[in-house]
Regions:
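A short helix->beta-strand "capping" segment at the edge of beta-propeller domains
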Residues: 1-17
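Beta-strand-rich domains and repeat architectures in extracellular enzymes and scaffolds
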Residues: 12-37, 59-60
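Surface loop/turn motifs at the tips and blade-to-blade linkers of beta-strand repeat domains
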Residues: 12-17, 51-56, 89-94, 130-134, ...
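Residue-level detector of Asp-centered blade-edge/turn motifs that repeat once per structural unit
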Residues: 26-28, 63-65, 102-104, 142-144, ...
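Conserved beta-strand positions in repeat-built beta-propeller and related beta-rich domains
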Residues: 31-37, 68-74, 109-114, 149-154, ...
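Short loop/turn segments that connect beta-strands within beta-propeller blades
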Residues: 43-47, 80-84, 121-125, 163-167, ...
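Blade-level signature of beta-propeller repeat domains, shared across WD40, Kelch, NHL, RCC1
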Residues: 181-222
Length: 222
């Protein structure tokens, strides 16, 4: 297993009126982050919050290329990012959802206290696959065929690449002590965006290089 210290290359916020970042995603232009009663769009080039939607946003956030998906309580909402209208709602299995991401037609949801990641049918919420973790799951993302998730244990957080079939940990990036992660997303290239929990911040972390191959977003989970 590869181990390294996480390299934080950017930090945004805190933002006025936002006490906690609960989930995070990226639409190719804006970083969207959940803050309880709003979904906020952040321009990572300027660090400015440019838009907000009034929706319940208490946990993970995802983007499928057109729509946003937002965990809230025991459900997942599908949201029009332009109007903020909730289009459909599906059940979130078992409650206690944390991270959320989209990869090639399915949703992937982290369960915090159950230490699990579920692959879900986005139409019904049915569980298609479950991966076990040995730490609390606080975020999940796919990039270039790699499944990554964020963890928390005490004051320690890390980002870890895992085998999507077995859950075996293949690589870890250790965050500084006391720096938590609440939501994880890739920009499809050389960085991850991480929610900063009660700090109210969003952080960018450098993604490890894979030879000369450039990233291009979420890839098919084999």
């Amino acid at each position: 297993m590869k181990q390294a210290a996480a390299e934080i290359i950017g930090e945004y916020g805190p933002f006025p009126g936002i006490e906690k970042v609960n989930g995070i995603t990226y639409d190719g232009q804006h970083v969207w982050f959940a803050s309880g009663d709003k979904l906020n769009a952040l321009d990572p080039k300027t660090g400015e919050k440019v838009h907000a939607l009034d929706v319940a946003a208490h946990a993970g956030t995802a983007f499928d290329g057109r729509y946003l998906f937002q965990l809230s309580g025991d459900s997942i909402q599908k949201i029009d990012p332009n109007s903020g209208r909730v289009l459909t709602t599906i059940p979130a299995p078992g409650g206690g959802g944390s991270g959320l991401t989209w990869a090639e037609g399915t949703l992937w949801m982290g369960q915090y206290r159950n230490r699990r990641i579920h692959q879900l049918d986005p139409r019904t919420g049915a569980v298609l696959r479950t991966i076990e973790s040995n730490r609390f799951v606080t975020g999940v993302t796919w990039v270039d065929g790699e499944l990554w998730h964020a963890t928390l244990e005490g004051d320690e957080s890390d980002l870890r690449r895992v085998d999507p079939q077995t859950g075996e940990v293949l690589e870890t990036l250790e965050m500084p002590t006391g720096v938590s992660v609440s939501g994880l997303e890739s920009d499809g290239g050389d960085q991850f965006f991480c929610g900063g929990g009660s700090s109210g911040k969003v952080r960018a972390v450098r993604r490890p290089r894979r030879g000369s191959t450039a990233g291009s977003g979420s890839a098919t989970p084999e």
